[in-house]
Protein backbone atom coordinates (compact mmCIF):
# COMPACT_ATOMS: atom_id res chain seq x y z
CA UNK A 1 0.00 0.00 0.00
CA UNK A 2 2.93 2.32 0.62
CA UNK A 3 4.23 4.59 -2.10
CA UNK A 4 7.70 4.43 -3.60
CA UNK A 5 10.02 7.43 -3.33
CA UNK A 6 9.28 8.15 -6.99
CA UNK A 7 5.53 8.11 -6.36
CA UNK A 8 5.87 10.46 -3.40
CA UNK A 9 7.91 12.78 -5.62
CA UNK A 10 5.10 12.84 -8.20
CA UNK A 11 2.58 13.63 -5.46
CA UNK A 12 4.69 16.42 -3.99
CA UNK A 13 5.53 17.89 -7.41
CA UNK A 14 1.87 18.45 -8.26
CA UNK A 15 1.15 19.53 -4.69
CA UNK A 16 3.63 22.37 -5.23
CA UNK A 17 1.26 23.64 -7.94
CA UNK A 18 -1.65 23.46 -5.47
CA UNK A 19 0.30 25.48 -2.90
CA UNK A 20 0.69 28.32 -5.41
CA UNK A 21 -3.08 28.92 -4.97
CA UNK A 22 -4.39 26.96 -1.99
CA UNK A 23 -7.59 29.05 -1.58
CA UNK A 24 -8.52 28.74 -5.27
CA UNK A 25 -7.88 25.00 -5.36
CA UNK A 26 -9.68 24.47 -2.05
CA UNK A 27 -12.70 26.45 -3.18
CA UNK A 28 -12.92 24.46 -6.40
CA UNK A 29 -12.59 21.14 -4.54
CA UNK A 30 -15.40 22.03 -2.11
CA UNK A 31 -17.67 23.32 -4.88
CA UNK A 32 -17.17 20.06 -6.80
CA UNK A 33 -17.85 18.11 -3.61
CA UNK A 34 -21.06 19.98 -2.80
CA UNK A 35 -22.35 19.96 -6.39
CA UNK A 36 -21.48 16.31 -7.03
CA UNK A 37 -22.52 15.04 -3.60
CA UNK A 38 -25.10 17.49 -2.20
CA UNK A 39 -25.60 15.33 0.90
CA UNK A 40 -22.12 16.40 2.06
CA UNK A 41 -23.30 20.00 2.34
CA UNK A 42 -25.51 18.97 5.28
CA UNK A 43 -22.37 18.49 7.41
CA UNK A 44 -21.46 22.17 7.03
CA UNK A 45 -23.83 24.45 8.94
CA UNK A 46 -22.19 27.61 7.63
CA UNK A 47 -22.50 26.50 3.99
CA UNK A 48 -25.96 24.86 3.97
CA UNK A 49 -27.57 28.07 2.72
CA UNK A 50 -25.34 28.14 -0.39
CA UNK A 51 -27.53 26.65 -3.11
CA UNK A 52 -25.96 27.77 -6.38
CA UNK A 53 -22.43 27.52 -7.68
CA UNK A 54 -22.36 31.33 -7.94
CA UNK A 55 -23.22 31.63 -4.24
CA UNK A 56 -20.48 29.14 -3.43
CA UNK A 57 -17.93 31.02 -5.55
CA UNK A 58 -18.85 34.28 -3.78
CA UNK A 59 -18.43 32.82 -0.27
CA UNK A 60 -15.20 33.88 1.43
CA UNK A 61 -15.93 31.38 4.22
CA UNK A 62 -16.05 28.53 1.71
CA UNK A 63 -12.77 29.68 0.17
CA UNK A 64 -11.18 29.88 3.64
CA UNK A 65 -12.40 26.42 4.58
CA UNK A 66 -11.12 25.02 1.29
CA UNK A 67 -7.72 26.50 2.11
CA UNK A 68 -7.85 24.94 5.59
CA UNK A 69 -8.68 21.51 4.15
CA UNK A 70 -5.92 21.55 1.55
CA UNK A 71 -3.34 23.04 3.93
CA UNK A 72 -4.00 20.16 6.36
CA UNK A 73 -3.86 17.62 3.55
CA UNK A 74 -0.62 19.12 2.25
CA UNK A 75 0.94 18.76 5.70
CA UNK A 76 -0.08 15.10 5.71
CA UNK A 77 1.18 14.41 2.19
CA UNK A 78 4.57 15.96 2.99
CA UNK A 79 5.03 13.35 5.73
CA UNK A 80 5.16 10.69 2.99
CA UNK A 81 3.07 8.20 4.93
CA UNK A 82 4.59 8.96 8.35
CA UNK A 83 1.61 11.08 9.31
CA UNK A 84 0.21 9.55 12.50
CA UNK A 85 0.75 12.75 14.51
CA UNK A 86 -1.20 14.73 11.91
CA UNK A 87 -3.95 12.15 11.35
CA UNK A 88 -4.86 11.53 15.00
CA UNK A 89 -6.28 14.99 15.83
CA UNK A 90 -7.89 15.25 12.39
CA UNK A 91 -9.62 11.88 12.83
CA UNK A 92 -10.64 12.86 16.36
CA UNK A 93 -12.39 16.05 15.21
CA UNK A 94 -13.91 14.48 12.09
CA UNK A 95 -15.22 11.44 14.00
CA UNK A 96 -16.43 13.00 17.25
CA UNK A 97 -17.29 16.61 16.42
CA UNK A 98 -18.08 16.76 12.70
CA UNK A 99 -19.18 13.11 12.21
CA UNK A 100 -17.74 12.92 8.67
CA UNK A 101 -18.14 9.41 7.22
CA UNK A 102 -15.21 7.77 5.43
CA UNK A 103 -17.38 7.75 2.31
CA UNK A 104 -17.25 11.55 2.28
CA UNK A 105 -13.44 11.34 2.41
CA UNK A 106 -13.66 9.19 -0.72
CA UNK A 107 -15.87 11.81 -2.35
CA UNK A 108 -13.49 14.67 -1.57
CA UNK A 109 -10.53 12.57 -2.75
CA UNK A 110 -12.26 12.14 -6.12
CA UNK A 111 -12.84 15.90 -6.27
CA UNK A 112 -9.18 16.60 -5.49
CA UNK A 113 -8.12 14.31 -8.35
CA UNK A 114 -10.60 16.01 -10.72
CA UNK A 115 -9.43 19.51 -9.78
CA UNK A 116 -5.75 18.59 -10.16
CA UNK A 117 -6.47 17.02 -13.53
CA UNK A 118 -8.41 20.05 -14.78
CA UNK A 119 -6.02 22.70 -13.44
CA UNK A 120 -2.69 20.94 -14.09
CA UNK A 121 -3.07 18.48 -16.97
CA UNK A 122 0.59 18.80 -17.95
CA UNK A 123 1.79 17.95 -14.43
CA UNK A 124 -0.86 15.38 -13.60
CA UNK A 125 -0.54 12.53 -16.06
CA UNK A 126 -1.43 8.90 -15.44
CA UNK A 127 1.60 8.21 -13.21
CA UNK A 128 0.97 11.27 -11.03
CA UNK A 129 -2.76 10.48 -10.84
CA UNK A 130 -1.99 6.92 -9.79
CA UNK A 131 0.44 8.12 -7.13
CA UNK A 132 -2.01 10.71 -5.79
CA UNK A 133 -4.78 8.10 -5.69
CA UNK A 134 -2.51 5.84 -3.62
CA UNK A 135 -1.55 8.69 -1.27
CA UNK A 136 -5.20 9.66 -0.74
CA UNK A 137 -6.15 6.01 -0.22
CA UNK A 138 -3.45 5.72 2.45
CA UNK A 139 -4.82 8.86 4.11
CA UNK A 140 -8.39 7.47 4.08
CA UNK A 141 -7.27 4.07 5.37
CA UNK A 142 -5.46 5.68 8.28
CA UNK A 143 -8.39 7.99 9.02
CA UNK A 144 -10.73 4.96 9.00
CA UNK A 145 -8.40 3.08 11.34
CA UNK A 146 -8.43 6.00 13.78
CA UNK A 147 -12.22 6.30 13.44
CA UNK A 148 -12.48 2.64 14.45
CA UNK A 149 -10.29 3.21 17.52
CA UNK A 150 -12.61 6.07 18.48
CA UNK A 151 -15.68 3.87 18.04
CA UNK A 152 -16.98 5.91 15.10
CA UNK A 153 -18.52 3.73 12.42
CA UNK A 154 -18.45 6.45 9.76
UniProtKB/Swiss-Prot annotation:
Q: Which InterPro entries match?
A: Globin, Globin-like_sf, Myoglobin
User: Where on this chain does heme b bind?
Assistant: 94
Instruction: List Phosphothreonine occurrences by residue.
Output: 68
- Tell me the gene name: MB
The record's disulfide annotation reads none
What name has this protein been given in UniProt? Myoglobin
UniProt KW keywords: Cytoplasm, Heme, Iron, Metal-binding, Muscle protein, Oxidoreductase, Oxygen transport, Phosphoprotein, Transport
Q: EC top class, in one word?
A: oxidoreductase
Domain spans labelled Globin:
2-148
Amino acid sequence: MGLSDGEWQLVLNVWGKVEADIPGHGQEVLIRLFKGHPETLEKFDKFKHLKSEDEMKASEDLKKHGATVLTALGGILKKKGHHEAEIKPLAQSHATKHKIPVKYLEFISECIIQVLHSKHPGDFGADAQGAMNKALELFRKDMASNYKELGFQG
